[in-house]
Amino acid sequence: STKEWIASVGCDIFGGGISALGWKEGEMDLVWDRSVSKADGNQLTLDAPLTMALDNKWGTVKVLRYSWPGRIAEAGLENLTLASDYDKKYPKDEDHCWTGVSIENAENCWVRRVNFKHFAGSAVIVQRTGSKTTVEDCVSTEPVSEIGGMRRSTFYTMGQQTLFQRCYSKQGIHDFSAGFCAAGPNAFVQCDSEESLGFSGSIDSWACGLLFDVVNIDGHDLVFKNLGQDKNGAGWNT
Protein backbone atom coordinates (compact mmCIF):
# COMPACT_ATOMS: atom_id res chain seq x y z
CA SER A 1 0.00 0.00 0.00
CA THR A 2 2.00 2.92 -1.35
CA LYS A 3 1.47 6.61 -0.69
CA GLU A 4 0.45 7.07 -4.32
CA TRP A 5 -2.21 4.37 -4.18
CA ILE A 6 -3.59 5.68 -0.88
CA ALA A 7 -3.89 9.16 -2.38
CA SER A 8 -5.59 7.75 -5.50
CA VAL A 9 -8.45 6.32 -3.40
CA GLY A 10 -8.74 9.52 -1.38
CA CYS A 11 -7.75 8.11 1.99
CA ASP A 12 -4.62 10.09 2.76
CA ILE A 13 -6.54 13.02 4.26
CA PHE A 14 -10.07 12.99 5.65
CA GLY A 15 -10.91 16.67 5.37
CA GLY A 16 -9.56 19.81 6.94
CA GLY A 17 -6.05 19.26 5.61
CA ILE A 18 -5.24 17.11 8.64
CA SER A 19 -3.60 13.77 7.83
CA ALA A 20 -3.34 12.22 11.31
CA LEU A 21 -6.19 9.77 10.66
CA GLY A 22 -5.29 9.15 7.02
CA TRP A 23 -4.01 5.80 5.81
CA LYS A 24 -0.25 5.40 6.05
CA GLU A 25 2.13 3.70 3.64
CA GLY A 26 2.46 -0.02 4.35
CA GLU A 27 -0.45 -0.15 6.80
CA MET A 28 -3.08 -1.37 4.31
CA ASP A 29 -1.23 -4.37 2.86
CA LEU A 30 -3.31 -7.48 2.19
CA VAL A 31 -1.83 -10.90 2.95
CA TRP A 32 -3.46 -13.80 1.09
CA ASP A 33 -2.95 -17.36 2.29
CA ARG A 34 -2.94 -19.56 -0.80
CA SER A 35 -1.59 -22.82 -2.18
CA VAL A 36 0.16 -22.90 -5.55
CA SER A 37 -1.55 -25.58 -7.63
CA LYS A 38 0.63 -25.05 -10.71
CA ALA A 39 3.84 -23.21 -11.56
CA ASP A 40 4.83 -22.51 -15.16
CA GLY A 41 7.86 -20.25 -15.43
CA ASN A 42 6.88 -16.96 -13.84
CA GLN A 43 3.16 -17.80 -13.90
CA LEU A 44 1.46 -19.23 -10.82
CA THR A 45 -1.97 -20.83 -10.57
CA LEU A 46 -3.51 -20.50 -7.12
CA ASP A 47 -6.15 -22.58 -5.37
CA ALA A 48 -8.42 -19.57 -4.75
CA PRO A 49 -8.78 -16.14 -6.37
CA LEU A 50 -7.19 -12.95 -5.12
CA THR A 51 -9.61 -10.21 -4.15
CA MET A 52 -8.16 -7.09 -5.75
CA ALA A 53 -6.30 -6.22 -8.93
CA LEU A 54 -2.50 -6.30 -8.89
CA ASP A 55 -0.96 -3.39 -10.78
CA ASN A 56 2.75 -2.54 -10.85
CA LYS A 57 1.75 1.11 -11.06
CA TRP A 58 0.82 0.99 -7.37
CA GLY A 59 3.56 -1.24 -5.99
CA THR A 60 4.91 -4.77 -6.04
CA VAL A 61 3.61 -8.11 -4.85
CA LYS A 62 5.69 -10.75 -3.07
CA VAL A 63 5.13 -14.50 -3.02
CA LEU A 64 6.49 -16.07 0.16
CA ARG A 65 6.80 -19.78 0.80
CA TYR A 66 6.17 -20.86 4.38
CA SER A 67 5.48 -23.84 6.62
CA TRP A 68 3.24 -23.81 9.67
CA PRO A 69 3.91 -26.72 12.03
CA GLY A 70 1.14 -27.14 14.56
CA ARG A 71 -1.50 -25.20 12.67
CA ILE A 72 -4.95 -26.44 13.69
CA ALA A 73 -6.90 -28.10 10.87
CA GLU A 74 -10.04 -30.17 10.32
CA ALA A 75 -11.61 -29.20 13.66
CA GLY A 76 -15.23 -28.36 14.31
CA LEU A 77 -17.82 -27.45 16.91
CA GLU A 78 -21.48 -28.39 16.50
CA ASN A 79 -24.82 -29.13 18.17
CA LEU A 80 -24.29 -27.01 21.30
CA THR A 81 -25.83 -24.15 23.25
CA LEU A 82 -23.30 -21.63 24.59
CA ALA A 83 -24.54 -19.03 27.08
CA SER A 84 -22.58 -16.34 28.91
CA ASP A 85 -23.52 -16.09 32.59
CA TYR A 86 -24.05 -12.42 33.51
CA ASP A 87 -25.23 -10.53 36.58
CA LYS A 88 -29.02 -10.42 36.21
CA LYS A 89 -29.18 -7.25 38.33
CA TYR A 90 -27.44 -5.34 35.54
CA PRO A 91 -29.17 -5.59 32.13
CA LYS A 92 -26.06 -4.14 30.43
CA ASP A 93 -23.49 -6.02 32.49
CA GLU A 94 -20.15 -6.46 30.75
CA ASP A 95 -18.21 -8.38 33.39
CA HIS A 96 -18.88 -11.69 31.67
CA CYS A 97 -17.81 -13.62 28.58
CA TRP A 98 -17.58 -11.59 25.37
CA THR A 99 -16.84 -14.25 22.75
CA GLY A 100 -18.57 -17.54 22.05
CA VAL A 101 -16.13 -19.09 19.55
CA SER A 102 -12.82 -17.63 18.34
CA ILE A 103 -11.00 -19.33 15.47
CA GLU A 104 -7.29 -18.55 15.24
CA ASN A 105 -4.19 -20.21 13.72
CA ALA A 106 -6.52 -22.66 11.98
CA GLU A 107 -7.77 -23.76 8.57
CA ASN A 108 -10.55 -25.98 7.27
CA CYS A 109 -12.60 -25.62 10.45
CA TRP A 110 -16.32 -25.23 11.08
CA VAL A 111 -19.00 -24.15 13.56
CA ARG A 112 -22.39 -25.71 12.94
CA ARG A 113 -25.78 -25.65 14.66
CA VAL A 114 -24.68 -23.70 17.73
CA ASN A 115 -27.04 -21.51 19.75
CA PHE A 116 -25.38 -18.46 21.37
CA LYS A 117 -26.88 -16.34 24.14
CA HIS A 118 -25.82 -13.19 26.01
CA PHE A 119 -22.31 -12.71 24.58
CA ALA A 120 -21.21 -9.07 24.71
CA GLY A 121 -18.80 -9.18 21.76
CA SER A 122 -19.11 -11.89 19.10
CA ALA A 123 -20.88 -15.20 18.79
CA VAL A 124 -18.22 -16.30 16.29
CA ILE A 125 -15.07 -14.40 15.37
CA VAL A 126 -12.59 -15.64 12.78
CA GLN A 127 -9.24 -14.06 13.57
CA ARG A 128 -6.72 -12.88 10.98
CA THR A 129 -4.95 -16.26 11.04
CA GLY A 130 -8.15 -18.19 10.30
CA SER A 131 -8.74 -19.52 6.77
CA LYS A 132 -11.24 -21.79 5.01
CA THR A 133 -13.82 -21.58 7.80
CA THR A 134 -17.53 -22.43 7.58
CA VAL A 135 -20.08 -21.13 10.09
CA GLU A 136 -23.58 -22.39 9.38
CA ASP A 137 -27.03 -22.74 10.95
CA CYS A 138 -26.06 -20.75 14.05
CA VAL A 139 -28.29 -18.46 16.14
CA SER A 140 -27.29 -15.56 18.40
CA THR A 141 -29.85 -13.85 20.64
CA GLU A 142 -30.17 -11.73 23.79
CA PRO A 143 -26.69 -10.15 23.86
CA VAL A 144 -25.90 -8.36 27.12
CA SER A 145 -23.69 -5.27 26.89
CA GLU A 146 -23.64 -1.53 26.47
CA ILE A 147 -24.45 -0.27 22.98
CA GLY A 148 -21.33 1.04 21.24
CA GLY A 149 -17.66 0.42 20.54
CA MET A 150 -16.63 -3.04 19.38
CA ARG A 151 -19.54 -4.77 21.07
CA ARG A 152 -22.03 -7.08 19.39
CA SER A 153 -20.13 -7.78 16.18
CA THR A 154 -22.07 -11.00 16.11
CA PHE A 155 -20.72 -13.00 13.18
CA TYR A 156 -17.37 -11.39 12.43
CA THR A 157 -14.36 -12.29 10.30
CA MET A 158 -10.93 -10.76 10.02
CA GLY A 159 -9.68 -13.82 8.15
CA GLN A 160 -10.15 -15.15 4.63
CA GLN A 161 -12.14 -17.77 2.75
CA THR A 162 -14.84 -17.62 5.41
CA LEU A 163 -18.41 -18.70 4.70
CA PHE A 164 -21.26 -17.74 7.01
CA GLN A 165 -24.51 -19.32 5.85
CA ARG A 166 -28.01 -19.56 7.30
CA CYS A 167 -27.03 -17.65 10.45
CA TYR A 168 -29.44 -15.57 12.55
CA SER A 169 -28.69 -12.63 14.84
CA LYS A 170 -30.97 -10.55 17.04
CA GLN A 171 -30.07 -7.20 18.63
CA GLY A 172 -26.54 -7.14 17.30
CA ILE A 173 -24.76 -3.93 16.38
CA HIS A 174 -22.76 -5.26 13.43
CA ASP A 175 -24.54 -8.57 12.93
CA PHE A 176 -22.59 -9.72 9.85
CA SER A 177 -19.23 -8.02 9.44
CA ALA A 178 -15.63 -8.11 8.26
CA GLY A 179 -12.68 -6.38 9.91
CA PHE A 180 -9.53 -4.44 9.10
CA CYS A 181 -7.91 -5.52 5.82
CA ALA A 182 -9.66 -8.89 5.85
CA ALA A 183 -8.06 -10.37 2.74
CA GLY A 184 -11.09 -12.40 1.68
CA PRO A 185 -12.90 -13.73 -0.10
CA ASN A 186 -15.52 -13.82 2.66
CA ALA A 187 -19.22 -14.52 2.14
CA PHE A 188 -22.46 -14.17 4.08
CA VAL A 189 -25.21 -16.23 2.44
CA GLN A 190 -28.88 -16.60 3.43
CA CYS A 191 -28.42 -14.85 6.77
CA ASP A 192 -31.03 -12.89 8.75
CA SER A 193 -30.94 -10.32 11.52
CA GLU A 194 -33.65 -8.64 13.57
CA GLU A 195 -33.63 -5.43 15.60
CA SER A 196 -30.16 -4.53 14.33
CA LEU A 197 -28.54 -1.60 16.13
CA GLY A 198 -25.88 -0.87 13.51
CA PHE A 199 -24.87 -1.60 9.94
CA SER A 200 -23.53 -4.83 8.49
CA GLY A 201 -20.67 -5.00 6.01
CA SER A 202 -17.04 -4.13 6.58
CA ILE A 203 -16.66 -2.20 9.84
CA ASP A 204 -13.07 -1.11 9.28
CA SER A 205 -10.63 -0.43 6.44
CA TRP A 206 -10.36 -2.20 3.08
CA ALA A 207 -11.88 -5.64 3.66
CA CYS A 208 -11.75 -7.07 0.14
CA GLY A 209 -13.76 -9.73 -1.68
CA LEU A 210 -16.83 -9.37 0.55
CA LEU A 211 -20.07 -10.99 -0.64
CA PHE A 212 -23.57 -10.67 0.81
CA ASP A 213 -26.10 -12.91 -0.94
CA VAL A 214 -29.75 -13.15 0.20
CA VAL A 215 -29.06 -11.39 3.51
CA ASN A 216 -31.91 -9.65 5.34
CA ILE A 217 -31.01 -6.95 7.87
CA ASP A 218 -34.01 -5.70 9.83
CA GLY A 219 -33.58 -2.29 11.42
CA HIS A 220 -30.38 -1.11 9.77
CA ASP A 221 -28.29 -1.10 6.58
CA LEU A 222 -25.75 -3.00 4.55
CA VAL A 223 -22.91 -0.51 4.06
CA PHE A 224 -20.21 -0.43 1.39
CA LYS A 225 -18.74 3.07 1.43
CA ASN A 226 -15.99 5.42 2.53
CA LEU A 227 -16.39 5.70 6.30
CA GLY A 228 -14.04 8.67 6.40
CA GLN A 229 -12.85 9.52 9.90
CA ASP A 230 -15.17 6.99 11.54
CA LYS A 231 -13.53 4.06 13.30
CA ASN A 232 -10.36 6.12 13.77
CA GLY A 233 -9.94 6.79 10.06
CA ALA A 234 -11.37 3.68 8.41
CA GLY A 235 -11.80 5.26 4.99
CA TRP A 236 -13.06 2.87 2.32
CA ASN A 237 -14.45 -0.13 4.14
CA THR A 238 -14.30 -2.46 1.15
What are these regions (language model features)?
Residues K3-A7:
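Extreme N-terminal leader/anchor segments
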Residues D12, V63-L64, T129, P143:
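Short, charged/polar low-complexity linear motifs in solvent-exposed/disordered segments
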Residues I13-E94, W98:
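Small/polar beta-strand repeat architecture
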Residues E25-M28, P69, D95, I103, ...:
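Residue-level marker of regulatory loop/turn positions in helix-turn-helix DNA-binding domains and
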Residues K57-S67, P91-S102, H118-S122, I147-Y156, ...:
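Extracellular beta-strand/beta-solenoid scaffold signature
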Residues S8, S19-A20, N216:
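Beta-strand-enriched cores of mature, soluble protein domains
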Residues A73-S84, E107-H118, G130-S145, M158-H174, ...:
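Right-handed parallel beta-helix
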Residues A48, V126-R128:
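Glycine-rich, histidine-containing beta strand-loop boundary motifs that form or position
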